């Protein structure tokens, strides 16, 4: 309904501009303008659907990324995400393993 209202407002604005300046448009010009407006509305409607699809996928992939990072932290894998500066790491629980900081994990078991 909002798109129809936008199109109607745009057509009325076009009619007002044409009427105010006394510009005479031929039937072909009027038809071309109306067709262009209709094409742009159809394109906008298609893009709105694509936006919704991407937003849905982005939310699900963001959730997947969050779950993956939590799982990595629980397993003690390196996810500190910082570079060693003067041999120290600023993130709590991380140690310097040049050139990156790694999360402290369980000690290695001797074979």
Curated annotation (Swiss-Prot):
Stored SUPFAM superfamilies: Cyclotides
Family annotation (InterPro entries): Cyclotide, Cyclotide_moebius_CS, Cyclotide_sf
Keywords: Cytolysis, Disulfide bond, Hemolysis, Knottin, Plant defense, Signal
Disulfide bridge positions per record: 80-94, 84-96, 89-101
Proregion positions: 29-75, 105-111
Cleavable signal peptide: 1-28
Cross-link (Cyclopeptide (Gly-Asn)): 76-104
BP terms from Gene Ontology: defense response; killing of cells of another organism
Domain remarks in the Swiss-Prot or TrEMBL record: The presence of a 'disulfide through disulfide knot' structurally defines this protein as a knottin.
Free-text function comment from the UniProt entry: Probably participates in a plant defense mechanism. Has hemolytic activity.
Protein name in UniProt: Kalata-B7
């Amino acid at each position: 309904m909002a798109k129809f209202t936008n199109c109607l407002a745009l057509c009325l604005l076009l009619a007002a501009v044409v009427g105010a300046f006394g510009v005479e448009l031929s039937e072909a010009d009027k038809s071309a303008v109306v067709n262009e407006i209709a094409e742009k509305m159809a394109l906008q409607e298609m893009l709105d659907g694509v936006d919704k699809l991407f937003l849905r996928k982005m939310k699900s992939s963001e959730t997947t990324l969050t779950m993956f990072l939590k799982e990595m932290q629980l397993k003690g894998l390196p996810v500190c995400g910082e570079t060693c500066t003067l041999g120290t790491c600023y993130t709590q629980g991380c140690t310097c393993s040049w050139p990156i900081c790694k999360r402290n994990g369980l000690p290695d078991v001797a074979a």
